[in-house]
């Protein structure tokens, strides 16, 4: 980028060619080599593929070839890849002799060529057949490996004892093992038939060939094992379908990663037992540190970036038909959830816009269909919620609401078995049960004793017992029959007894099983009929709708060869014997590794594991278990999977099992053991972190030499929004005065920070505002105060402006605590608000009336009188702790601490254990070396004890506050003052160095008993306190915070200080494993609320270097010295350098020393270590001094031109350092704060809002059913809307137009953004004087008398022409009505009507269009470039701009232009018209294809009246994409042009005739003018216009992609009549602006102008005065293709108006003709007001109109005036009155006005304006963005 910027700066100088000469010299030689080595003509789509493969091809070859891509790859393989591998004498096999001679000439190591004729086609390739095998140690096999099996390769090595290394080229598509469709169809295609793969290179069928289907198996093996030989197989390179394979002997097979011995064919697999978790962790850690242990052999291949779609429910789909491009999937996923309304046809329309792109040619139609079908799942959303601040009870309720089914499932076994186990535990009832014996002298039941003794005589169930003697029974019968038994008493008699539980259950054998079944039925019902749990829904949503990137990869396997097979089909003769005649036996087939398994979903059962080849030995997998069950297999194999993996999950497919061969042993053979069980995966000790974030803040040395982009403004970050983001308080008509805090306008004794919101003084009585719907705050206050809600609302309207009571926030969210403060002021009360984050006070602090209100943040947020039932849980909300609240309230010099909240940090056992282990082993810290202690355990013993405690410790949470900021911002001082307050007395300080500890002690001056609180980081671990402050946290080992939390059980609050930009800790021991932990910078980044981006230390010059706010009054300096100044402070790069300087008498420390501040300037030594400095250390070195910096030493290292240290070089040359580029992973994410916090807002808002999208559930359920649409679909058809997303916040009236009627292919082109442009603050100009013009003297010409002789009698057919033997029809007269003269007035000028004149467009093509000679794009010539540059300089001269200045791009303004452009495109045509033109968004319509059609018009002007046949104006119909993409660019340019345009240059775009007249009166003078109207202006603009337009866009930093699109379109336009050259097309975006700018640039190139007034409108122009011509004009005129029509006159005509210093007047000659035409064709009623308005512009000038118009046109002016006086109503003739309009009539008109434009509003008198504003329901009616968009003007941007 630095070189590019330098070259761009030299564009306009003569040094550019000399500067670019080295670039050209460096390009010439590679380009020559490329054209010489790769001369073939390549398709343009192939060049990116070749470059990505590392093949240096220029793409400029011209030699044709049937398959040039393969030829280029083959050439690179032979003459680049193999050329470098032939280091010893080598042999080449299977190569044409001519090709071998070229190869040997390039590298003499290629010494031997061996060819074998194996097929009939080999006769043409090889002149002879070799009789020997390779004799060299290195052999190259050219494009033949796919025809050989591993057994044959083993025989080749056996027959060639000297052969050690075999390099092979293999041509096979890697994706052929799972599909028969190519992933690169533009490079190759293939077809699988049986066991044959038919390969077709680049659709060249003559060059196609067949190869075995088993050939891809060469890409899946890592070694070939035979009883006598072991060969390794390695893939060196891959270039699409071409692979370089290395086969070499002498290397053993790769050992297994498992602890088990490898399984041999004669050894059954040993059973494995699952290890415990500790053993698994131990094994994982051992594997982690044993670097020499081999890893799992994986191989991957480059394929298009794609994702794998999930399987359809209960349906199987091939993997190939579920692969879609990742970019398309992500874009469609976002699109279906971003549109306001989603129709069922919208996904198909979006897919259609992508499916025809050439880069997506590999995607199958089935895949596109599956993608659009899957995308209708847009209504599905993850059912998640984020309740961070809920109470424990609320969280518990939410937890049970989400997981109650899991708990019910866990309790089901107990509930179902408990009734069945009840008979086993038949205990008596735990409490006695009452039993009634008698009542009112009647026996109800007998006593228990008698009941047991006499069962046969008493009622009730018999209880078996021992029978009594017979005489006792007889005695009982006798007494009972004679009524001699005692009579029961009257009162009830009750007996208590404990019965068995089973006796209480009726029919327990039936009831208990039924009860068990009943208890299990809810779980069964929920499992089969209810939806999935929230966790299952969440997991399945992300699993299926967020698929990971698909990768073509698999695990390499070993291939076992039991017996070598002959390499050749015919055996070669022995060296001393004749060649054998008998052929060798046929070798067995090379069994392919099975095809990849298809992924099994939850809806389909798992598939059986495919049977593998009997010769493949798989290494055991230890990282991922196979998802399939093991099964018996007829081979000696280890379990593995050769399946290709997509992201993390395997995708199995069940292929057909290959047929057995005679070499395969039978399945029952004892040598075929079954597959081993799968090995469980090993746990990962160190989790994988984000790869995009480095583990260290140290950048590579190369990064230090980068020149970053421009430094952004230090105020680039927007300030926080105000408390009223939706209300235009400043424009509220019900208030007066400035915006001030509430406590200033209404003084009272408020609670702190409760009345800080802004408001204004109300000056009108209460308005009748509607009662708010979300009024829970009013309800609570009403119940507490006793006042009705209507009284409260009325009282608020008496003190607050209407804009604060009725706005989108109140209507959508509810009332805020600002309203509560106003109520407290009105009723002199105070409110205590209880919220989850704390207790807040509002209102009058001295009031005796105190109300209590509770606030719940929701959703929805709500004010209530009673709190929700909630319990307190420790650490549930860290901000609610006592210490955190005190820290939030602490102020020092009126400033709060720079943080907004505390975070709950949970300690990590892994981090703490890593650090304590390194400390115990002496790798980090020095305490482990201290083995002696005067009393108690030694420090080493304490570390050992702490290490053992960490082993059994559990994670715990503490509150954490992070104070971060730039060097010298003052992080430490406020914390020191905080610790001196009483709530923070129990603290301790942990510092990284002794010097820093001494500084803390010096600043805080502790007493003797508190000195222990200040310690270094190691000794601090052995102390305890409630509060821990860690200074310079990033200079401490990783995991120190976690270890400190676990080492101190009394710790409750941690405050960490540090700057993430100043680097972090690096251990000096090479054995320390602390660096394996993730960086603390990125771990603590989420805890940084505010980054203090200011400095009190560094001087102003250093601060400007970094773009930091400086509070140091010293200007400072950066200088270079030749030697060290005496008594100076010196910073060095290394410790040994510092020691050397100290020995020489200088004060020296290393650069990495932090928290060091020098009052005087210090030096920075530049030496050989400077290039190794990290940006962090460079930042520290530059920010140590309050005065300045000296550089000494090797100053070349910090030179501006060729310095190797970027930061030092920028400092020395007084440049700027872009911290975002220096620290790209840190600085952009820091929440920068530019001033201290001086107020904290405690503002709450209540209300509810439904933000979930509305889903058409009926349509969603019927997607699988046939769809019946009406025969004619109306534009408002909404039955196919699937999802509707609501508006969360915003105006009730959506400023965006409906897009439901747009075609599905056009809807993705609309961004549908919300406009955010503020209201315009422009004011209309008021004339100082209001002169009344003198009434003109009207001549006595009547309209009818002049019209009767205006059109002479003539034959219209004589004006027609013949085109292709067909007469034109521009002067139709048959059946045309007329009354003014002898013929129809329409014959005054030709009529262009394509519907009735088929010759109109063909006859106009020659004059209106210019064509290219061929279909090749137009090439910008050097002449075009020079002329375009000159025109751009002239245009900049006209605007007073610097041609070399480049303005930064403003994305916010550009998005506003997108909104305006979209609005204009949707509102300029009816919905029916847009639907009818749906083909404009057809994806099959090329962007460069333009449809030309004729414009229908009856153009009447001076040139066309009484003229003959004229060519029509052509319009260009472009693709909707062009209009919607380049339209905002032109509107963006218009904004800057309108701001920069000088007042003496007038553009008529968007101006009214009255404004034209006013401008002429202000700027024009004299009586000499130059008018010009070009001939064929659009067709005369060639390539120079394209250059001019591109330079205009580059000046505004328009994205290059849009500039290139514009240039490509202008040079490649193609129409139905042929390709067009560069020309202006009416209908392209920005036609008027570009034409006007081109015209202005030509005028400033033609004349030497100095403030001359100029009027420009497209090709029309008027120049005031007679300026001298430019000296360069004669040369430039020859280069231009324009045809001028220059006229020097005193009455210039501009856009149909005569202009003069007295104003402008409509040309009465053309207006008279138009009135004649509309009178004859009866269209006067429709056009009269328009013509009257045009005429009134000149008429209102009074008698000056005679000076404006030429004298010969005054009769027509009189006739037109006569016509309007006799044909207009009195109300219409007011426009012709020179007197002002009566105010009463204006006020009557205002009462009927619904909306007014800015132009209309500016003409109204003051009283009418006030009335219109008072009646307006909009905050700013006349300048509202919606009104401006309706006018299609950029009025808000005019200022």
Swiss-Prot record:
| PROSITE patterns noted in UniProt | ALPHAVIRUS_MT, PEPTIDASE_C21, PSRV_HELICASE, RDRP_SSRNA_POS
- Any single Pfam family the record assigns to this protein: Peptidase_C21
Q: Which residues form the Alphavirus-like MT domain?
A: 58-219
* Domain (+)RNA virus helicase ATP-binding: start-end pairs: 935-1092
Query: Where do the segments described as Disordered lie?
Result: 253-277, 578-623, 645-703
Q: Does the keyword Nucleotide-binding apply?
A: yes
One Gene Ontology term from the biological process aspect of the record: methylation
| E.C. code | 2.1.1.-, 3.4.22.-, 3.6.4.-, 2.7.7.48
Bias type Pro residues, positions: 584-599, 652-670
Annotated ranges, domain RdRp catalytic: 1567-1673
The family classification in the record reads:
Belongs to the Tymoviridae non-structural replication polyprotein family.
Protein name as catalogued: Non-structural replication polyprotein
- Origin organism is Eggplant mosaic virus
């Amino acid at each position: 980028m630095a070189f590019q910027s330098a070259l761009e700066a030299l564009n306009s100088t003569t040094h550019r060619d000399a500067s670019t000469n080295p670039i050209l010299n460096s390009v010439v030689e590679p380009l020559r080599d490329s054209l010489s080595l790769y001369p073939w003509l390549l398709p343009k789509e192939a060049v990116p593929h070749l470059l990505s493969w590392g093949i240096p091809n220029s793409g400029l070859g011209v030699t044709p070839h049937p398959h040039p891509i393969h030829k280029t790859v083959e050439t690179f393989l032979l003459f680049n890849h193999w050329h470098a591998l032939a280091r010893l004498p080598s042999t080449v096999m299977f190569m044409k002799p001519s090709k071998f001679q070229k190869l040997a000439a390039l590298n003499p190591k290629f010494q031997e060529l061996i060819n074998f004729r194996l097929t009939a086609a080999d006769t043409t390739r090889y002149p002879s057949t070799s009789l020997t095998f390779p004799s060299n140690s290195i052999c190259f096999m050219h494009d033949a490996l796919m025809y050989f099996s591993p057994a044959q390769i083993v025989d080749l090595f056996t027959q060639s004892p000297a052969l050690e290394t075999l390099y092979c080229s293999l041509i096979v598509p890697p994706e052929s093992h799972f599909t028969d469709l190519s992933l690169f169809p533009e490079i190759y295609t293939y077809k699988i038939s049986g066991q044959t793969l038919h390969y077709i290179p680049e659709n060249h069928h003559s060059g196609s060939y067949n190869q075995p289907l088993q050939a891809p198996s060469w890409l899946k093996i890592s070694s070939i094992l035979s009883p006598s030989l072991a060969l390794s197989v390695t893939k060196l390179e891959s270039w699409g379908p071409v692979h370089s394979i290395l086969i070499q002997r002498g290397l053993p097979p790769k050992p297994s990663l498992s602890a088990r011995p490898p399984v041999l064919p004669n050894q059954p697999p040993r059973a494995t037992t699952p290890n415990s978790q500790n053993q698994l962790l131990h094994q994982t850690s051992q594997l982690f540190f044993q670097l020499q242990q081999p890893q799992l052999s994986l191989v991957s291949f480059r394929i298009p970036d794609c994702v794998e779609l999930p399987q359809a429910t209960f349906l199987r789909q091939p993997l190939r038909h579920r692969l879609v491009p990742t970019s398309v999937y992500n874009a469609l996923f976002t699109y279906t959830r971003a549109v306001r309304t989603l129709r069922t046809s919208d996904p198909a329309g979006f897919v259609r816009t992508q499916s025809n792109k050439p880069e997506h040619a590999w995607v199958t139609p089935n895949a596109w269909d599956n993608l659009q079908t899957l995308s209708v799942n847009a209504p599905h959303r993850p059912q998640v919620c984020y309740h961070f601040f809920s109470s424990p009870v609320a969280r518990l309720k939410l937890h049970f609401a989400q997981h109650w089914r899991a708990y019910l499932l866990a309790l089901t076994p107990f509930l179902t078995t408990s009734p069945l186990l009840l008979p086993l535990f038949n205990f008596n009832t735990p409490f006695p049960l009452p039993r009634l014996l008698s009542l009112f002298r009647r026996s109800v039941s007998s006593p228990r004793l008698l009941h047991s003794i006499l069962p046969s005589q008493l009622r009730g169930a018999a209880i078996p017992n021992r029978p009594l003697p017979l005489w006792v029974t007889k005695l009982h019968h006798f007494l009972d029959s004679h009524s001699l038994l005692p009579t029961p008493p009257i009162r009830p008699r009750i007996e208590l007894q404990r019965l068995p539980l089973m006796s209480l259950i009726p029919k327990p054998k039936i009831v208990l099983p039924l009860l068990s079944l009943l208890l299990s039925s809810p779980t069964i019902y929920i499992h089969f009929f209810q939806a999935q749990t929230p966790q299952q829904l969440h997991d399945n949503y992300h699993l299926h709708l967020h698929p990971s990137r698909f990768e073509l990869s698999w695990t390499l396997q070993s291939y076992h060869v039991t017996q070598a097979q002959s390499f050749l089909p015919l055996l070669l003769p022995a060296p001393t014997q004749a060649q054998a005649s008998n052929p060798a036996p046929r070798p067995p087939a090379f069994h392919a590794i099975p095809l990849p398994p298809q992924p099994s979903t939850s809806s389909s059962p798992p598939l059986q594991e495919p049977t593998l080849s009997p010769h493949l030995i798989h290494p055991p997998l230890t990282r991922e278990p196979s998802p399939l069950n093991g099964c018996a297999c007829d081979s000696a194999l280890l379990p593995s999977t050769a399946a290709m993996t997509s992201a993390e999950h395997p995708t199995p497919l069940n292929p057909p099992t290959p047929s057995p061969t005679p070499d395969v042993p039978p399945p029952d053979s004892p040598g075929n053991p079954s597959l081993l069980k799968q090995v469980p995966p090993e746990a990962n000790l160190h989790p994988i972190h984000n790869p995009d974030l480095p583990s260290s803040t140290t950048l590579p040395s190369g990064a230090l030499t980068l020149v970053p982009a421009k430094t952004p403004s230090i105020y680039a970050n927007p300030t926080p929004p105000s408390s009223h983001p939706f209300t235009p308080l400043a424009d509220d008509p019900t208030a007066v005065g400035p915006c001030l805090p509430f406590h200033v306008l209404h003084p009272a004794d408020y609670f702190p920070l409760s009345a800080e919101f802004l408001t204004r003084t109300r000056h009108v009585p209460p308005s009748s505002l509607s009662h708010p719907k979300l009024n829970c705050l009013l309800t609570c206050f009403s119940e507490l105060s006793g006042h009705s809600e209507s009284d409260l609302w009325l009282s608020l309207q008496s003190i607050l402006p209407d804009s604060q009571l009725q706005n989108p926030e109140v209507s959508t969210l509810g009332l805020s605590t600002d309203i509560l403060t106003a109520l407290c002021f009105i009723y002199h009360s105070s409110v205590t608000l209880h919220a989850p984050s704390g207790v807040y006070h509002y209102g009058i602090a001295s009031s005796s009336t105190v109300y209590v209100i509770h606030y719940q943040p929701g959703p929805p947020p709500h004010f209530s009188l009673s709190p929700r039932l909630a319990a307190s849980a420790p650490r549930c909300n860290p901000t609610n702790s006592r210490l955190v609240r005190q820290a939030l309230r602490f102020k020092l010099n009126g400033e709060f601490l720079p943080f907004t909240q505390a975070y709950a940090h949970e300690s990590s056992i892994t981090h703490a254990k890593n650090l304590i282990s390194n400390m115990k082993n002496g790798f980090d810290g020095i305490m482990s070396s201290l083995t002696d202690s005067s009393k108690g355990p030694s420090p080493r013993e304490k570390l050992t004890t702490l290490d053992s405690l960490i082993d059994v410790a559990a994670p715990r949470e503490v509150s954490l506050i992070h104070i971060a900021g730039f060097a010298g911002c003052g992080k430490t001082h406020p914390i020191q003052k905080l610790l001196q307050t009483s709530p923070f007395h129990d603290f301790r300080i942990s510092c990284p160095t002794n010097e820093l500890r001494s500084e803390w002690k010096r600043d805080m001056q502790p007493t003797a008993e508190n000195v222990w609180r200040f310690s270094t980081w190691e000794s601090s671990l052995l102390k305890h306190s409630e509060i821990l402050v860690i200074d310079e946290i990033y200079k401490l080992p990783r995991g120190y915070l976690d270890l400190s939390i676990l080492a101190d059980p009394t710790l409750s609050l941690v405050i960490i200080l540090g700057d993430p930009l100043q680097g972090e800790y690096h251990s000096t021991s090479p054995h320390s494993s602390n660096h394996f932990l993730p960086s603390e910078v990125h771990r603590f980044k989420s805890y940084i609320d505010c980054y203090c981006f200011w400095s009190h230390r560094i001087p102003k010059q250093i601060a400007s270097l970094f773009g930091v706010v400086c509070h140091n009054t010293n200007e400072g300096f950066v200088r270079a010295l030749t030697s060290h100044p005496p008594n100076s402070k010196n910073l060095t790069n290394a410790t040994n350098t510092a020691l050397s300087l100290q020995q020489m008498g200088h004060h020296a420390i290393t650069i990495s020393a932090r928290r060091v501040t020098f009052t005087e300037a210090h030096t920075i030594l530049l030496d050989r270590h400077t290039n190794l400095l990290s940006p962090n250390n460079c930042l520290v070195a530059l920010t140590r001094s309050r005065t300045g910096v000296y550089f000494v030493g090797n100053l070349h290292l910090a030179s501006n031109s060729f310095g190797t240290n970027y930061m030092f070089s920028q400092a020395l040359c007084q440049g700027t350092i872009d911290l975002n580029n220096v620290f790209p992973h840190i600085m952009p994410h820091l929440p920068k704060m530019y001033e201290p916090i001086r107020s904290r807002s405690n503002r709450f808002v209540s209300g509810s809002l439904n933000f979930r999208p509305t889903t058409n559930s009926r349509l969603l359920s019927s997607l699988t059913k046939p769809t019946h649409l009406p025969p004619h679909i109306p534009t408002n058809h909404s039955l196919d809307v699937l999802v509707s997303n609501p508006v969360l916040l915003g105006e009730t009236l959506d400023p965006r137009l409906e897009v439901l009627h747009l075609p599905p292919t056009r809807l993705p082109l609309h961004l549908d953004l919300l406009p955010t442009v503020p209201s315009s603050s422009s004011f209309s100009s008021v004339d100082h004087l209001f002169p009344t013009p003198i009434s003109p003297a009207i001549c006595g010409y009547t309209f009818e008398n002049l019209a009767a002789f205006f059109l002479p009698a003539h034959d219209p057919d004589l004006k027609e022409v013949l085109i292709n033997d067909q007469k034109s029809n521009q002067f139709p007269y048959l059946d045309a009505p007329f009354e003014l003269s002898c013929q129809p007035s329409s014959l005054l000028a030709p009529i262009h009507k394509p519907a009735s004149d088929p010759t109109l467009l063909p006859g106009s093509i020659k004059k209106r269009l210019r064509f290219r000679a061929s279909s090749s794009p137009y090439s910008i010539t050097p002449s075009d470039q020079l002329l375009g540059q000159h025109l751009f300089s002239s245009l900049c001269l006209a605007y007073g701009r610097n041609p070399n200045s480049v303005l930064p791009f403003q994305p916010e303004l550009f998005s506003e232009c997108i909104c305006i452009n979209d609005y204009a495109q949707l509102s300029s045509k009816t919905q029916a018209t847009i639907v009818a033109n749906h083909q404009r968004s057809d994806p099959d319509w090329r962007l460069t294809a333009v449809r030309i059609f004729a414009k229908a018009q009856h153009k009447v002007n001076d040139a066309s009246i009484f003229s003959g046949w004229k060519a029509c104006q052509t319009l260009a119909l472009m693709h909707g994409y062009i209009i919607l993409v380049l339209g905002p660019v032109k509107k963006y340019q218009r904004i800057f042009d309108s701001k920069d345009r000088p007042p003496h240059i007038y553009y008529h775009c968007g101006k009214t005739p009255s404004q034209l007249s006013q401008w002429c009166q202000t700027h024009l003078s004299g009586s000499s003018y130059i008018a010009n109207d070009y001939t064929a202006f659009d067709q005369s603009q060639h390539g120079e216009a394209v250059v001019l337009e591109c330079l205009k866009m580059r000046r505004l930093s328009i994205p290059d992609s849009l500039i290139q699109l514009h240039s490509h379109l202008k040079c490649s336009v193609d129409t139905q009549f042929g390709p067009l050259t560069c020309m202006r097309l009416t209908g392209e975006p920005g036609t008027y602006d570009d034409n006007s700018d081109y015209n202005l640039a030509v005028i400033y190139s033609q004349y030497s102008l100095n403030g001359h007034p100029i009027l420009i409108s497209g090709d029309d122009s008027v120049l005031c005065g007679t300026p001298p011509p430019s000296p360069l004009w004669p040369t430039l005129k020859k280069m231009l293709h324009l045809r001028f029509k220059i006229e020097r006159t005193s009455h210039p005509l501009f856009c149909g108006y005569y202009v003069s210093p007295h104003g402008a007047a409509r040309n009465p000659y053309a207006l008279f003709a138009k009135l004649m035409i509309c009178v004859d064709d009866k269209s006067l009623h429709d056009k009269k007001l328009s013509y009257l308005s045009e005429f009134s512009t000149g008429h209102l000038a009074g008698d000056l109109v005679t000076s404006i118009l030429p004298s010969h046109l005054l009769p027509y002016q009189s006739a037109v005036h006569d016509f309007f006086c006799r044909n207009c109503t009195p109300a219409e003739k007011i426009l012709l009155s020179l007197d002002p309009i009566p105010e009463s009539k204006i006020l009557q008109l205002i009462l009927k006005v619904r909306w007014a434009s800015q132009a209309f509003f500016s003409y109204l008198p003051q009283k009418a304006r006030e009335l219109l504003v008072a009646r307006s329901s909009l905050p700013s009616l006349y300048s509202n963005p919606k009104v401006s968009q309706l006018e299609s003007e950029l009025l808000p941007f005019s200022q």
